[in-house]
Amino acid sequence: MKVEDYFHDILGERKIHLTLIDPEEQTPEEAVEIAEAAIRGGTDGIMLGGSTTDSSELDATAGALRENIDVPIILFPGNTTGVSRHADAIFFMSLLNSNNPYWIIGAQALGAPAVKKMGIEALPMGYLVVEPGGTVGWVGDTKPVPRNKPDIAAAYAMAAEFLGMRLFYLEAGSGAPQHVPEEMISLVKRCTDQILIVGGGIRTGADAARVAGAGADIIVTGTVVENSSNVEDKIREIVEGMGSL
């Protein structure tokens, strides 16, 4: 089954949780342990990427995950090096509010031949950085959307949908002190038919409940996993929060 179909099947019944793992933060063996714990906690898939610039680390981690887990492995590339043949799909995304055309379409053009050659399912996605934006906002040379301007985010989402992007990701930034505002999530959801993904600043079940209740279809957590001494319990808390609507 294609990953996009997998998403739609789940969304017919409930919200989706994805766990983000950065290959640079641990060994492939440790990444497998984290993924297995997250799956026991209820996560629906593993996102792989982030700050990585070493394609060999990414490939080794993706390969180890492929041998040990059954949920989809989805690439979340930080640059053209973020591609591996072991993945099921890739968030093929454009950083819409970057000031640098490289992050809007340049990196995508450079990476597309590899994605095509490897036969990875490409999930067309608009990626929008919201204040404070974190590292991705700085590296991606963005103009983060102000938290009190949901209409700007909605305009970007509609433009992305008209350009054929079937997924849309609101990003507050890794380790952000607050998640994307509920008002912004709700307006974006009302204005488009895209699968809406929200990440950044989601640390607790209560956070997850607010974000899911506002309209997010998919919630992504990463930093909270890196900082948790019990990944399974933390993911279960977040997943249960999402289901408490």
From Swiss-Prot:
Positions contributing to sn-glycerol 1-phosphate binding: 169-175, 200-201, 222-223
EC number: 2.5.1.41
Top-level EC class: transferase
Pathway(s) of this molecule: Membrane lipid metabolism; glycerophospholipid metabolism
GO cellular component: cytoplasm
One of the record's GO molecular function terms: magnesium ion binding
Catalytic activity: sn-glycerol 1-phosphate + (2E,6E,10E)-geranylgeranyl diphosphate = sn-3-O-(geranylgeranyl)glycerol 1-phosphate + diphosphate
Keyword terms: Cytoplasm, Lipid biosynthesis, Lipid metabolism, Magnesium, Metal-binding, Phospholipid biosynthesis, Phospholipid metabolism, Transferase
Activity regulation description: Inhibited by EDTA in vitro.
Entries under InterPro entries matching the protein: GGGP/HepGP_synthase_I, GGGP/HepGP_synthase_sf, GGGP_HepGP_synthase, GGGP_synth
Main location per the UniProt record: cytoplasm
Protein's UniProt keywords contain Lipid biosynthesis: yes
Location(s) in or outside the cell: Cytoplasm
UniProt pH dependence: Optimum pH is 6.0-9.0.
Cofactors, names only: Mg(2+)
Alphabetical list of PANTHER family matching this protein: HEPTAPRENYLGLYCERYL PHOSPHATE SYNTHASE (PTHR40029:SF2), PTHR40029
NCBIfam families registered for this protein in UniProt: GGGP, GGGP-family, PRK04169.1-2
HAMAP family listed in its UniProt record: GGGP_HepGP_synthase
Subunit structure as annotated in this protein's UniProt entry: Homopentamer.
Name the record gives this protein: Geranylgeranylglyceryl phosphate synthase
Species the sequence originates in: Methanothermobacter marburgensis (strain ATCC BAA-927 / DSM 2133 / JCM 14651 / NBRC 100331 / OCM 82 / Marburg) (Methanobacterium thermoautotrophicum)
Lineage: Archaea, Methanobacteriati, Methanobacteriota, Methanomada group, Methanobacteria
